[in-house]
UniProtKB/Swiss-Prot annotation:
Binding, ATP: A377, V378, T379, G380, S381, G382, K383, T384
Protein encoded by which gene: DRS1
Polar residues bias (residue ranges): 913-926
Catalytic activity: ATP + H2O = ADP + phosphate + H(+)
PANTHER family assigned: ATP-DEPENDENT RNA HELICASE DBPA, ATP-DEPENDENT RNA HELICASE RHLE-RELATED
Domain notes for this protein: The Q motif is unique to and characteristic of the DEAD box family of RNA helicases and controls ATP binding and hydrolysis.
Motif (Q motif): 333-361
Gene Ontology terms: cellular component: nucleolus; preribosome, large subunit precursor
Regions of compositional bias (Basic and acidic residues) in chain numbering: 56-75, 847-858
One Pfam family in the UniProt entry: DEAD
Subcellular localization: Nucleus, Nucleolus
SMART domains: DEXDc (SM00487), HELICc (SM00490)
Name the record gives this protein: ATP-dependent RNA helicase DRS1
Taxonomic source organism: Mycosarcoma maydis
Amino acid sequence: MRVQQSKPSAAAKRKAAATSLTTSPQKKRANTTPKRAKDDDFIMTLDSDDDVEDLDAAHVDADHVASDNSEREPEPEAELEPEHSSTPPDGKLTKNQRKRKEKAHLVGKEKIIESLASRSKTNSAAAVKDAMALDKDFEFDIFGDGSAVDYTGAEANGWDMSVTGTRMHKKLNVDDIIEKRRKVLPTLPAPVEEEEENSDEDDQDDDLDDDIKYAEYQDSDDDEDRFGGGNGNIVGQNKDEDQQDAAELDSQEDPLSSDAESASDDDDDNDNDDDDDELQVAEQDEESNSSEDDSDLETEQEKARKAAFFAEDPIATSADSSSKSKSTNDAESSFGAFDLSRPVLRALSSLSFHKPTPIQSRTIPIALAGKDIVAGAVTGSGKTAAFMIPTIERLTWRAKTRTPHEAKSRVLILAPTRELAIQCYSVGKSIAKFTDIRFCLCVGGLSVKSQEAELKLRPEVVIATPGRLIDHVRNSASFTLDDIEILVMDEADRMLEDGFADELNEIVKSCPKGARQTMLFSATMTDDVEQLVRLSLKRPVRLFVDPKRTTAKKLIQEFVRVRGTGTGGVAGADGLSGIQDQPATWISGGRKSEDAQRPALLLSLCTRTFTSQTMIFVRSKKLAHQLKIVFGLLGLSAGELHGDLSQEQRIDALTDFRDGKTDFLLATDLASRGLDIKGVQTVINYDMPGQFEAYLHRVGRTARAGRNGRAVTLVGEADRRMLKLAIKKSSAEQIKHRIIPSAVAAHMCETLERLKPEVDAVLREEKEEKALRIAEMELKKGENMANHADEIFSRPKRTWFQSGSEKTQASALSKAGYQATMDARSSSKQKDKYAGLSRKKRRSKMMRQEIERERKDASGSAGAKTASGGGMDAGIRAAKKAQRPTKLGVAPLKLANKSKGKQSGRNARPSATGGSKTKSSFNRDFSGNKRR
């Protein structure tokens, strides 16, 4: 059968044209017929033109790889035609000449394709050459697991806070509302830059960075510069004065008092007033030391109880001499000295944990021995790794199980907050990544069902918060605490407080008591036997590496004085400034007037000096949210972290702040304990907490792991006791005084006053959006109840170990305890309200307040008050005024009493005549009165 020839395609023509470039014209003429026949046979075997294009491109690349400058040379046909062909006289081209011209034309069309092909070939060759070169950042992977890459990522991003089981529903984001309001907001004046200030205060501080001044209390006569007057061991004094005893602070004057105030008090008060003031200060110092500071002086009975309860440190007692102690410390300069297993050492090396910290050196060998531990160290000293490393090491030697039913949950780690539990979970997973140890995270805010599924597999380590753990113990099938061998409590002093007391007792009762090891860790750990005895500890070992309640060595503590004025408040009205509608005479110089100045001082710091990587601690969730709105309206990127947010929002806020997406993190004390957020440079305390432990945990978010850090605290008149305690517990080089120019603070007050309507509008719109979401949720809930009623009611009811009233009472007790830590004045006497004032000023202030209260009562009653009542109040005021002490040297004014004089005259006449009392009775009878 005759095969029909197909017409040559365009690809075949391009191939022929490419072939013609590599052969001479003579050879092409000689082999014209065979070549055409061969091409015809080749064309008959093709299926499509697309394959021909790919093959042609590869063929052209192979033929022209040797000629590097073929693209820049002129066309070969133009050079060969004059030598090997002759043009007829009539100017007509021959058949072969026309073919060569057509081929040259086709080559011109495909020149771009050939250029790209040759260029890609050249680039690929260059890439191969670059790949063979040695990278300057090349590192040998010793273990072959890519651990160096993992460490680089961990160093850049910190601990991984991502968790599973979150509810990815649409969230209410106030940032969208703020951005919408900000677009229509008029342009606000820019804050005064530090470089452009021309005030006299800044001219004196040009040699100091960031307006930082040493607290030179005794050398400064200016009231604006004087901060902590009377304290002799503050920075700026001589070296000998720096080494004075810290106990001298208790006998000195108020740190916030000034020379001018002291002089006026000396002029106005008498000796009795001075004695009363000194007695009052002494009583307040005694109360402060008893309520806020653990007494260093222990009675013999307390020492005996602690000696009987605690066991001796075996490492400390084994070092009989200083040389042996030194050799022991040298031997424990690396984790290899603890005889840890290879997977644990491998993980520590990948995390760049080479040398153990002091708390780790003392804790790991004792924990490996299975002893109970009560440990304390400063913030950022590696306490989490101190209990996680020995725990994982002990689990590596456990008996291997063949089936999941034989697995046991052996370790329970408790944390007071969800974020701290998530961080412990991340640290544990990183240290145990080369082992087969399984972890389970049980915290509130995440899916209960996913946690139940993980607990059914009986993971070796369970990290939980107390509330969710009790929920799983009572309501999750096949999960118990009967096999717990190691119980760890992070931030144990918080777990021992009243808010967690009932839950902690329930957990301890569920855990076995026989061979259980218990370890307690905290930066402010207590050694009170009465609190620790309920945890069923067995001769625990006390490991307090650092002095009690001290800050990190590289932490600089700055204090900004807050002065009260007669202003009426700033943005946010009641919530933000803390001011209600009060007369100026009442709020002038008072506590609420100080609260009105705090937002302006805070924004002055955040817009001028600390512009990134700054954590700001406030005392309430409402204040944190309102400050976030103010920051957003001013164009400052800020996140918030408190209990009113969902768990997804809390994790997102932490992650954004850690990754640098937000510059500020406004948080309550929810984030003050245990969190290790990478890159925190500054911590700002919007107000001073009422207890020193809370202050230590707040400022401990910076200056961690030997890094530098700075803590700035806004201090008012009522915070002087906490200020004195902070000065006493810190070294001289750590305390500094920061002065914010009054012009900057006044400018920021004006800005906040302009923002007040916008803040109210954002809050109002957010409230409306929240109401709509609640309505939608209730509607969806009703639909689910109607469509899936049988399934919903068939679910078993979840139980709790407390009744509803007991749970409410425990919640109220926890809230009261937190408020007591935030404001020590709530439980103090009434005289603390006028602390720091002389007797004359105190009485004047009391009188002004009484007058204002009477004025309010008079206006509120609207004339209903009787005249007798008004006269009674006037009489009370007159009596109080008469009892006020007078100045020395002024004799009291004696007024003649006419009635008393007449009576004395009548009595004198009878006595002169020798009469008696009977005569006076007759005189009365003669006067007309009836005798009885």
